[in-house]
Amino acid sequence: ACILHLGMFSIALEQHRTHPLIDFGQHNDLLGFLNRWDALFYERIYTEWYPQNLPLRADGSVDYNAWAFMPLQSLIAGGIANTFGIEYRVATLALTLAAGFALAYVLYRLFIGCLNWRDRGVFDTRAFVGDESRNRLALWAVAAYAFSMASPVFITGYAEALSILLIALSVWCVLRGRYVLLLPVALLAALSRPVGVPLGAFVGLWWLWCTVNDYRRRRIEDASHSALSDAWAAFRGRFGQLLSALLVCSFAFVHPLHAALYTGRIDAY
């Protein structure tokens, strides 16, 4: 998939080079072509950090600026660049490729777990010997994702590969009931792309589904208690899970709050 996407970008670059109305300036090579648009802002965050003095429109509203982008991609890629003494554009592509390969492995495990859950009622991410059909189906699902229409972004300097990897790891934590481990993973996800609110909503809906299932199970196993008592017991048993969902939602406000405190404007983000 990476080779195919690189070929597509190379062809697109050649087409753009011959267009009389397009001038890439210093970004006229493949490395520069893969680090355009949003990737330029991530590089600017690495080199200049975020602006304290915001650009304003004629009506006084905040204009488009680097605060629209989360810092995690720039921080990790910048750390790689500083550690190995390489150019930032190379480091961010290396990070994206590594995150994409890791994402493929995590997705494979998630697909295996979902198939085991469907057939056995247990979310087990291990691929068992003799389950070639499940393994094959999971690999085909990963391939479909790797060759999807949006997948070329996974070899650019964008943060999508890193963000989706962290989302997939968050899903794994939720399905395995690792809610303490979920918190740092979800925080990193919220600092990679603005996914804190939908991720928190997912954790909240999962909490609701688990709580309702616990309540139904209690009513089936022992109907001697009142419905209210069983509902309270189910809620109390899943309270930590609910707290995790609320904390994950709160992570969505970390970057906007940082922007507001740093610039003195509540609408900086």
Question: Over which residues does each language-model region extend?
Answer:
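Short acidic/glycine- and proline-prone juxtamembrane loop motifs at membrane-interface regions
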Residues: 155-162
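Membrane-lumen/periplasm interface segments of specific transmembrane helices
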Residues: 2-18, 34, 200-269
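Membrane-interface transmembrane helices that cradle and orient dolichyl/undecaprenyl
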Residues: 120-121, 125-133, 170-181, 211-213
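Specific aromatic-rich, kink-prone transmembrane helix
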Residues: 106, 144-147, 162-181, 203, ...
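Short hydrophobic/aromatic helix or loop-helix immediately within or flanking a transmembrane segment
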Residues: 33-55, 59-85
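Transmembrane helices and adjacent periplasmic/lumenal helix-loop junctions
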Residues: 150, 184-208
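Short helix- or helix-capping micro-motifs
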Residues: 137-148, 186-190
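Transmembrane-helix motifs of polytopic, lipid-linked glycan transferases
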Residues: 78-82, 91-119, 124
